[in-house]
Amino acid sequence: MPTRTAIIAQFVPNSPLCQHLGIALTEVGNDRAVLTMPFKPELVTLGQTVHGGAIATLADTAAMAAAWADDVVPEKPGGSTASLTVDYVAPANASDLTAVGQVIRRGKRLCACEITVSDAGGQVIAKALATYSFA
């Protein structure tokens, strides 16, 4: 059976939602994950501003990937987000986005993660906290 890191490295590129949004996993390991989402006109709300739901989805996916970024071989591969709080601090205007997810506390079943979403210029767009629950 593969480790959680190996599982998530295969999951993200094969996820229909990630494929649709263009979300790519660029780094994963040691309780950390980095994901990118390219700007697409389909993701805007007003003008060229990326919709908050797309940003939240990127943050949620980064938290999940960070939670899975360890060397545990799971008995039952599965889990879900138990909670997600997103604070939007700046608009994402016509920009590719990068999310960095970092585990801040890992328990037996629950994993708390902090996520920072930035635009292509490095400006922080959103900060998020997520709790991931393993099956």
Predicted regions and their residues:
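Non-catalytic linker/capping segments at the edges of enzyme domains
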Residues: 1-36, 40-42
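HotDog/MaoC-like acyl-thioester-processing domains
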Residues: 2, 90-94, 98-100, 104-135
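A generic structural signal for short beta-strands and their flanking turns/coil linkers
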Residues: 19-21, 31-33, 78-84, 95, ...
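Hot-dog-fold acyl-thioester-processing enzymes
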Residues: 38-64
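Hydrophobic beta-strand-centered segment that forms part of the acyl-chain substrate-binding groove
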Residues: 50, 66-98, 103
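Hydrophobic alpha-helical segments of small multi-pass membrane proteins
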Residues: 53, 57-61, 83-88, 115-118, ...
